[in-house]
Design a protein with these regions (language model features):
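Intrinsically disordered, low-complexity mixed-charge segments
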Residues: 1
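Membrane-anchoring hydrophobic helices of lipid-metabolizing enzymes
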Residues: 4-134, 138-173, 242, 315-326
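Soluble catalytic domains of membrane acyltransferases
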Residues: 94-294
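C-terminal terminal-subdomain/extension
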Residues: 270-326
Length: 326
């Protein structure tokens, strides 16, 4: 059983420290002939950190080495780039994070859905993997588009890659246009507050932000699908945040993790944590009256019910997971 947010922070940080110490030792001493000191943790001994990191670096390094097809939709998604990235996404989902996904069989495949999940860090690995999981389960449907924070989509080095893989700037207008044209959407209503959670606050959902995306679902009668994602928050565990240097480069905060900036660019790679994704029963919206959008009390109730369901799914996933590493 995963220790989760309700147990000893000291014990959880000690496991994280052991794992990262083992990871740093293997990376820095790849060419050394000295015998390695084993970490006394079964799940760490079974996982080959060095091989996983080397393969991940190779796969990330091969991205973008293909000409664009020119067949790009209005939001920038490129089928050629997406096809080229599927092997990497399969590797991340099946081998690197060993993601267990449940509940997708209850999803309506006949119309667009709004998937609403807990936010898991600055980089949108959660949206990428959830989108990939839904597409694999429903291969005849369009790939869901995942909403990305505005500040991240404005970074010149990030925006093209995210857009090519289905990332869309998070705003009500984009969500409405996608749902109206039959595309499912993945949203993270915690916003920056959720992305900025430090390690001690992991898996405790923050208050949802403005309800623009959920209003778009109401307008389009798209079911709200709660999703709990566990594993992504430990992939880049934030120990603390530095605000001053972040503002200088246009970021909401600069995360300090056990590997970044200590390992330099290598520290930007995510850790091979164990992921569990639980998709809950959709919340249908067809029965809500025409005036639901103007009823703030009703809307607040729907949003709070959605948040509670996501927190329950996260807690269930933590109960199921043996540890952050598998």
């Amino acid at each position: 059983m995963d220790s989760g947010p309700g147990t000893s922070e000291h014990d959880e940080l000690e496991v994280l420290h052991l794992a990262l110490s083992d990871l740093r030792r293997k990376i820095r001493s790849r060419s050394s002939t000295r015998p390695e000191t084993r970490v006394d943790n079964e799940s760490l001994r079974e996982f080959d950190w060095q091989a996983a990191f080397n393969e991940l670096r190779h796969r990330f390094g091969s991205l973008g080495m293909v000409e664009r097809s020119g067949e790009v939709d209005e939001f920038g998604m490129d089928d050629v780039s997406l096809d080229r990235s599927r092997m990497l996404l399969d590797f991340l989902m099946d081998r690197y994070w060993r993601a267990e996904v449940s509940g997708l069989d209850a999803i309506d495949s006949g119309g667009p859905n709004l998937f609403v999940a807990n936010c898991s860090g600055l980089l949108p690995y959660d949206g990428l993997i959830l989108s990939h999981a839904v597409e694999r389960w429903h291969p005849t449907r369009d790939r869901p588009r995942f909403l990305v924070a505005d500040w991240l989509m404005t970074l010149p080095f990030a925006q093209p890659y995210l857009a090519q893989l289905g990332g869309v700037r998070a705003c009500r207008e984009n969500a409405d246009r996608l749902l109206r044209t039959g595309h499912s959407v993945i949203a993270f209503p915690e916003g920056v507050r959720g992305a900025a959670k430090v390690f001690a606050e992991r898996y405790r959902l923050k208050r949802f932000g403005r309800s623009g995306v959920i209003r778009a679902a109401l307008e389009n009668r798209a079911p709200l699908v709660p999703v709990g994602i566990v594993g992504a928050e430990e992939a880049h565990p934030i120990l603390f945040k530095a605000d001053l240097p972040a503002r200088a480069i246009g970021l909401p905060f600069a995360p300090v993790t056990p590997t970044f900036p200590l390992l330099g660019p290598l520290g930007l790679l995510p850790l091979p944590t164990k992921w569990i994704i639980r998709v809950g029963e959709p919340i249908p919206l067809e029965d809500l009256g025409a005036g639901a959008l103007d009823d703030e009390s009703l809307l607040s109730g729907v949003i709070e019910e959605l948040r509670e369901r996501i927190q329950e799914l996260v807690s269930e996933a933590l109960e199921r997971r043996a540890s952050a590493w598998g």
